[in-house]
Amino acid sequence: MRGRTMSVIKMTDLELAGKRVFIRADLNVPVKDGKVTSDARILASLPTIKRCLEAGAKVMVTSHLGRPTEGEYNEEFSLAPVVNYLNDALDCDVKLAKDYLDGIELNAGELVVLENVRFNKGEKKNDEALSKKYAALCDIFVMDAFGTAHRAQASTHGVGMNAAIACAGPLLANELEALGKAMDNPARPLVAIVGGSKVSTKLTVLESLSKIADQLVVGGGIANTFIAAEGHNVGKSLYEADLVETAKKLMKDCAIPVATDVACAKAFDENAEAVIKHVSEVQDDDMIFDLGPDSTAVLAEIISNAKTILWNGPVGVFEFKNFEAGTAGIAKAIADSEGFSVAGGGDTLAAIDKFGIKADVSYISTGGGAFLEFVEGKVLPAVAMLEERAKA
């Protein structure tokens, strides 16, 4: 997948009028007391749905929601709250179809939401018979859920292999374009920022990025392992002694600026006082929770000179006010940068919201696991399927 332009059919290039269009969206939103509590994913999918309706297509949209027992209907995981939301957002009569696998009737310009795909036996295993039933419902299959593109399931992969036409929806196409721009042929220097608690969970990401980034910035618990690799005491900080040698190797392969000063405390507590120390002064009972001001300034300078920025993970315990300065400084530098920036991952999005820089990031990825697997250089099954169908 790396180093080449992905060739897929785009929904925006197709004639949709009168066609039965099956959209696999990501409408996996939090629901409380029958109401959608965070509508970000629905909002992201609305332009695709509207475009199909305005073109006069017969529109079906579906998604998973939560983790119900497969093959069993469970009202707690119904897409009914999403249907209610769409009724208001689109100002039209949106129906919910529970039993649709043997066919469904709808008119041009009409929208039907097909109930949670995980209520169908065989969804997760990419069952061939189920995939063919989905495919029989439509003339055009639209894959628009980047967040599930790394899973080969019946509604993300199998249906596309069997549908008459399989294409990428606008949301997915934009995502692939932005990630491709950041990783396949980036304007340089490319600066990658990887935060998080453990090197082990991000090891393949770090190894992959060390090969393409001009500077690889590490933060959070990951940074502590690199500080230890430079021979410094990290006290009681979260770090992985067994990966110190791996960190040393990564530092040989790529420019990784390691913190020179850090914010420490004696306990993991929101009200703990942040004490700024040079890395050589960290004591046995200290815990490192953030970058110090000097290190943050150095990284901000590196980011300001970048032409491409890839951000995944905060650089400190930004949820605590006393340990948010490092992540806030990184966020501000990205916001002020004139380079092309892509950010992804749950904690990263929370940091973007907290520091109010959403409008200043060039592209915010909607996929957690899919974003990481793309960055690792892995082939995403749904994307591979779209590429294969584009050749046919």
UniProtKB/Swiss-Prot annotation:
GO molecular function: ADP binding; ATP binding; phosphoglycerate kinase activity
Catalysed reactions listed for this entry: (2R)-3-phosphoglycerate + ATP = (2R)-3-phospho-glyceroyl phosphate + ADP
Pathway connected to this protein: Carbohydrate degradation; glycolysis; pyruvate from D-glyceraldehyde 3-phosphate: step 2/5
InterPro entries: Phosphoglycerate_kinase, Phosphoglycerate_kinase_CS, Phosphoglycerate_kinase_N, Phosphoglycerate_kinase_sf
One GO process term, biological-process aspect: gluconeogenesis
Root EC class: transferase
Keywords: ATP-binding, Cytoplasm, Glycolysis, Kinase, Nucleotide-binding, Transferase
UniProt subunit comment: Monomer.
Family the UniProt entry places it in: Belongs to the phosphoglycerate kinase family.
HAMAP family found in the cross-reference section: Phosphoglyc_kinase (MF_00145)
Protein name: Phosphoglycerate kinase
Species in which this protein is naturally found: Photobacterium profundum (strain SS9)
Gene name linked to the record: pgk
